[in-house]
C-alpha cells in the first residue's frame, strides 16, 4: 500500500464532554470493538480495582476522572483509528484545547438527562473555532432522560449548530426498547436475542406499543420540519449527526462507530505562520508538538513529546529540523500508545500521533520538518490563569528535586509558572483548584519533593511589552512578575485595579491570552 493510501486510511478524533457524561466508557467500548481490550471495563470499578484503560495516571485511578489526554490507536473496518481521550474535568481545559488542535474531528458525548453542560459548551467553542466536524453521541438511554426532540433543540439553541438524528430512541430507562436507525433503515433491538430487525418486522414486533407510535410521529415531524442531511455541512462543522445509545450497556456504540467512520474526514492540512497550507499528502515529513507528558513510566522518570504528523511519513531514525532552535534532532526512540502501554514504532504517516522521547529538547508548539523547506505551524492557544498559589520546597535540601519537578510539570502545561519580580518567589497559575492538587500530588509522588503551597486567590492577569516595563508601576494593587518565557506580566488584585492601572498608564499596551 502506498503512503498516500495509508494516509487516507487515518481517522484521528478527540472525544469531548462534561465530567460524568460517559466519555471514558464510550472510549472503552470503541477500544473493545477495535480488539484492543478483551472486555470494556466500566468506569464504575473504583472499588473493584479495575480501572478504565484510558485513565492511567495514579491520581486519575484514585478519583475516577481523566486529567491528562490519553492517545489510543486501533485498526477497524479498513481504517486506522486514532482516539484522543481528553480530560472532561473543567480544570484541565488548556491540555484539552491543545489536544483539539491535533485532531480532524470531535465526538461530543452528552448525558441524555442533563443535556448540554458548561464544559461541553466550552470545548465545543474551541472545536467550532477550528471548523472541524462534530459527531454527537447522546448517552445513557438505559436511564430516564429528557425528550429527544428537546435535546436536539438544545443542541441548536445553546451551541448554535444544526443537527440531524441518525437514529431515534424507542422509549428510555426501564422502558427502553431500542433504536430506530434512520441511516440504515432498520431497528436496533435492546432486548431479546436478535440485535437487528427490518422495519416491517419491527412494525409487527412493536404493534400497539405507545413508545413506537411516538417514535413514528417524531420521525414524521423531523422529516417535515427538521434539517436536511448534508455530508458537506457535516465536514464543514455546520451540521452535527446525532446518535443515541448507552455506552455502559454497549448499545448503539458499534453502529455509531461504523457510521462515524463512513463520514469522518481524512487527515487535514495545517496552516503555517505565513498562512501556507501544508498538505498531508506532501512527501516531506512535518509535524508539531501539542503536548508534553512527564513520567508516563514512573520507573524511568521519562518525558514524552506528543507529535501530530501533519504531512509525509515518519521513519525510525530519521533526522528532523526543530524550527524554533534551528537545530537538527534524530527521531530514534519513538512510540505509539495504548494509554500507558506503548510500543516502539518503525514508521507512521500523516494523521498519526507519535510519542518522541524527550530529554528537554522540545516545547509545546514546536514544529518539526524534513528537507530544505523550513517553516513553523500556527501557534497553539495559551490560556490566562485565574487562580494563583505561592510555591516553595518544604525541605530546603530537596531544592534539586523541587526545581526538576516544577520545570517538567510546567513544560507539560499542567500549571503556569511565574516569578515575583521583586522577591523572586515562585507562583503557580491555573484555571481551577484541581490543577494545584494534581501538581502537589505529582511533585510528591513522582519527584519526592514535598511542597508548601499558599493560596493567593483570584488575579486578573495581563502581559506587557518589555520596553513598557517600569518597576515603579508595581503597587499594592498588583504584583509584577515574569512568566516562564521571561515576559513581564502584571497580576492585578481585581478588575478595579486593572482599570485603575489602565487609566494611569494609557500608553502601556496590556495583553490578555485566550
Swiss-Prot record:
GO molecular function, one term: GTPase activity
Family annotation (Pfam families): EF-G_D2, GTP_EFTU, RF3_C
Transmembrane regions listed in the UniProt entry: none
InterPro entries linked: EF-G-like_DII (IPR053905), EFG_III/V (IPR035647), G_TR_CS (IPR031157), P-loop_NTPase (IPR027417), PrfC (IPR004548), RF3_C (IPR032090), RF3_dom_3_sf (IPR038467), RF3_GTP-bd (IPR041732)
Keyword terms, alphabetized: Cytoplasm, GTP-binding, Nucleotide-binding, Protein biosynthesis
Record-annotated tr-type G domain positions: 8-268
CDD domains found in the cross-reference section: RF3
Binding site for GTP: 17-24, 85-89, 139-142
BP-aspect Gene Ontology terms: regulation of translational termination
Location relative to the cell: Cytoplasm
GO cellular component, one term: cytosol
Xref: PANTHER family: PEPTIDE CHAIN RELEASE FACTOR RF3 (PTHR43556:SF2)
Family according to the record: Belongs to the TRAFAC class translation factor GTPase superfamily. Classic translation factor GTPase family. PrfC subfamily.
Biological role stated in the UniProt entry: Increases the formation of ribosomal termination complexes and stimulates activities of RF-1 and RF-2. It binds guanine nucleotides and has strong preference for UGA stop codons. It may interact directly with the ribosome. The stimulation of RF-1 and RF-2 is significantly reduced by GTP and GDP, but not by GMP.
Alphabetical list of NCBIfam families matching this protein: prfC (TIGR00503), PRK00741.1 (NF001964), small_GTP (TIGR00231)
Protein name: Peptide chain release factor 3
Protein's organism: Streptococcus uberis (strain ATCC BAA-854 / 0140J)
